[in-house]
Amino acid sequence: MKNYQINLKKELNSIYPTLEHLQGVNPNGEHISFTNHYMMKDEKPFFGICGEFHYSRYDFHKWEDEIIKMKMAGINIIPTYIIWNHHEEIKGQFRWDGSFNIRYFVELCKKHQVEVILRIGPFVHGEARNGGLPDWLYGEPCNVRSNDERYLFYVKRYYQEIGNQVRGLFYKDGGPIIGVQLDNEYCHAGAPWEMTTGTSNEWINNGSYDTSVEEHHHHIEILKEFAIEAGMIAPIYTGTGWGGAQASPDTVLPLWGGYAFWPWIFYDESIKEHPVTPEFIYRNYRRLLIILNRLMIRLQCLLLAVKWVEG
């Protein structure tokens, strides 16, 4: 007769520190770091709940109200695009006032104890005009989103301007900026040069230019060097980590951004209803709570009835 055994023992996965190049300490000694399973803040597991807010697309008088609402909803990190063509619409003339005042926005986040990730582009997409690139860049004799020296000259100048605006607001300074994203959807997505729409219909290259993976990674490394030289020194540097994007994993942390709602599918006019998406994982516990509440009421009524009978 055969003997059978059931082994219910489960080997737990080992957890160990990793990504030593992506960490930082603030003046209070609090530490941001990573293990192979999760992010840590002050040596404890930290679950970052991000909510996008693009400051330059909203009236600055209302920023604080919106930040408070986001925090009340459970958001503890606000990533924000810095959209180049909002700040340098005219070549060489930068605007950082009013609704373009990135410093004021970050200071409000600090006031309400919300961390910040700066998404500095230079290309951000974000459904912005030219993906955020200024119109005047179209007329420059250079290949954007490449290692073209002329393009990199303008990018470096732009990064220096950003760095001047947010100086002293990084995590190492006691500020809320914990991360910097370099480009966006690099080698994955481009955008139309809007001024050519309806005529030549030209598009901004996604950055691939049929060059090697090593060259793509080198581009991200150059952007990181420019950011650091501009004073944008953060614990975390990120890049798009999906759809064939090149994020240089030894330089930045590849991140996946999922969409519960896919607006682009409605370009196909035959689609009338939005399908369930894999990013939309939700369980409605409210119905369960209602059922439990009703059961508790019935149980209380039953106990009162028993006491009345016994009494």
Task: Label the model's feature ranges.
Residues 63-131, 135-136, 220-229:
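Aromatic-lined substrate-binding rim segments of carbohydrate-active enzymes
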Residues 17-18, 24, 118, 123-154, ...:
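Substrate-binding/catalytic cleft of secreted carbohydrate-active enzymes
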Residues 50-52, 89-91, 207-210:
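A short, structure-level motif marking secondary-structure boundaries and short turns
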Residues 58-64, 95-101, 152-160:
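Glycine-rich anion/phosphate-binding loops
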Residues 30, 55-61, 87-88, 92-97, ...:
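Acidic-and-aromatic substrate-binding clefts and catalytic sites of carbohydrate-active enzymes
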Residues 52-54, 81, 183, 239:
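Conserved residues at the C-terminal ends of beta-strands
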